[in-house]
Amino acid sequence: MQGGEPVSTMKVSESEGKLEGQATAVTPNKNSSCGGGISSSSSSRGGSAKGWQYSDHMENVYGYLMKYTNLVTGWQYRFFVLNNEAGLLEYFVNEQSRNQKPRGTLQLAGAVISPSDEDSHTFTVNAASGEQYKLRATDAKERQHWVSRLQICTQHHTEAIGKNNPPLKSRSFSLASSSNSPISQRRPSQNAISFFNVGHSKLQSLSKRTNLPPDHLVEVREMMSHAEGQQRDLIRRIECLPTSGHLSSLDQDLLMLKATSMATMNCLNDCFHILQLQHASHQKGSLPSGTTIEWLEPKISLSNHYKNGADQPFATDQSKPVAVPEEQPVAESGLLAREPEEINADDEIEDTCDHKEDDLGAVEEQRSVILHLLSQLKLGMDLTRVVLPTFILEKRSLLEMYADFMSHPDLFIAITNGATAEDRMIRFVEYYLTSFHEGRKGAIAKKPYNPIIGETFHCSWKMPKSEVASSVFSSSSTQGVTNHAPLSGESLTQVGSDCYTVRFVAEQVSHHPPVSGFYAECTERKMCVNAHVWTKSKFLGMSIGVTMVGEGILSLLEHGEEYTFSLPCAYARSILTVPWVELGGKVSVNCAKTGYSASITFHTKPFYGGKLHRVTAEVKHNITNTVVCRVQGEWNSVLEFTYSNGETKYVDLTKLAVTKKRVRPLEKQDPFESRRLWKNVTDSLRESEIDKATEHKHTLEERQRTEERHRTETGTPWKTKYFIKEGDGWVYHKPLWKIIPTTQPAE
């Protein structure tokens, strides 16, 4: 291993056990590039670190951390090794003694990893045996790296206890001897389940019974339900406190108490589940045929009572829900027509709504809500069914966000104006990369509404033909392209019009999983795009990742070409401090007919250095393996296009004109169209009335759940309105390629 640069002297206060200086600690990784070198000497420690990219794979991590020993000795550097295969956290006096017996070992199965709320460097590892390591990293980023790796390893081995391990013999220890003996403190627990029997004679007697009654876990369930009720009362009393004063609901100790109590209940639920699995493995061979096993869940689910970090006001008799006149009653909404409806374009007017969004900034005021939410989540957990707090919402639906990706219709229409297959692929990449800054509103750290199943959104754009012909995005090979000759099949109205029309429709076709379908077309230019997207969200520790599963197909019927493309992932970072959003991942664009393809990479910011929102791309002719265009820059700022002829073009997205979409007034929209459906939520958010917005949002979600239960009970399948399922995807019911025949131009 190579040494790094020397760093500043470190000073440790023995009386207080606090780090007063700063040193560099590195956690290299054997299996990835996320590593660094470590060197040590008697006087200083140095290191070099590369940017860590988050991964949810299990990795062996090792490096120096500071370990708090006691008030006399204080903090000391120790060399730590995370052994994922064995599920152990080991430490040594230094790196040179790594081949010797470890100085200490913690079993991670059943452990709890807790970042400190006092500073951004410290964290604790609490083993199921009761032993605790208090550790300190060099900075917040290094701490997050260690915490993430430890949590992944802990979750893996905790789940393995119930799934893979056979029941072990219970062992009981003397609490007095185990707590006072240094040897017993250092000895790792052989299995996390053994700790659950410490000092509990009642459980010991139960373990000796050979034939347990089928309902022996009912008492445990009742005790857990009672504990959950007390925990809910605790949180309710804390949140009833004023937000300011001597004792407030935002007091740091109370916030930590809330988060810790919720985490404790989650751990107990995990333990209860393990007991059920163990009991099932005992009874599996002796059950008569046809017998079914039902899990004994607590009577009241915590998640049902704390959707947004507190009890919902409408759940009590003391509070009256706000009237929602525009929202459709349950009985009536279930009878809405599901047949496709033709939208009258004459009813559409230019959008006048103010869509300006303020960034979240620091979230100190909502810290209690976020801490409560985080206490319910596990690393890698699917967030599809998790209700996120209302204050992070944009004032638009996800379906409208997809429409906003079309806010440059001039660039979209200009794709088919390309004189060659190469030019058309480059134009598509130019359009694709310029669509995100408006679709994502720059990089605002908010999320759109999750669409209700059956929700739709309609709009259109009018684009003067002269602006498309003189588009500044035309490359040098197409500068002379003018308005095309009338296409066969175009109506006299379309030929005589000075504007192209791009029409857009989107529909939420599925609720679980959440899948949206959207379709846009320009009939005059014989082009359309059809896409389906499944938004799959995941909890990543201090960030949330959203994978856009699915694909889109752009059809240029005039040229007989199809361009298949995918979408990048989105990440919400620093959700506890100042949230921000970035895009990440590799996407591809392919045209099978012409042999041209594009590879686009949205780069996530590394922990150390690097730029935000960076994107690079290459357009290649696969047959000759020739790169015809390269792109670099930021997807929400400036893009640089370099063409094969040496020409370079810069596009400042902040100055790029946005064409306003045309929508029908609310009174002419159907009850399930996005803006009318979410009107009360949007109005409340505009007035900064978060509680009222939460109530309206809950009403919509409850209606959706009620209708879903009704369909399940009656065996009625959901019928989509505008999209038809074909294979694994969804296709618009009247795509342009079924109406207008594809032209096969001469090569």
From Swiss-Prot:
Catalysis performed (reactions): a 1,2-diacyl-sn-glycero-3-phospho-(1D-myo-inositol 4-phosphate)(out) + a 1,2-diacyl-sn-glycero-3-phospho-L-serine(in) = a 1,2-diacyl-sn-glycero-3-phospho-(1D-myo-inositol 4-phosphate)(in) + a 1,2-diacyl-sn-glycero-3-phospho-L-serine(out)
CDD domains: PH_ORP10_ORP11
Gene Ontology CC entries for this record: cytosol; Golgi apparatus; late endosome membrane; membrane; nucleoplasm
Highest taxon, organism lineage: Eukaryota
Protein name in the entry: Oxysterol-binding protein-related protein 11
Coiled-coil regions listed: none
Start-end of Basic and acidic residues biased regions: 689-713
Effect of residue 171 to W: Found in a neurodegenerative disorder with demyelinating leukodystrophy; uncertain significance
Phosphotyrosine, modified sites: 62
UniProt similarity note: Belongs to the OSBP family.
Gene from which the chain derives: OSBPL11
UniProt entry tagged with the keyword Ligase: no
Function: Plays a role in regulating ADIPOQ and FABP4 levels in differentiating adipocytes and is also involved in regulation of adipocyte triglyceride storage. Weakly binds 25-hydroxycholesterol. Interacts with OSBPL9 to function as lipid transfer proteins.
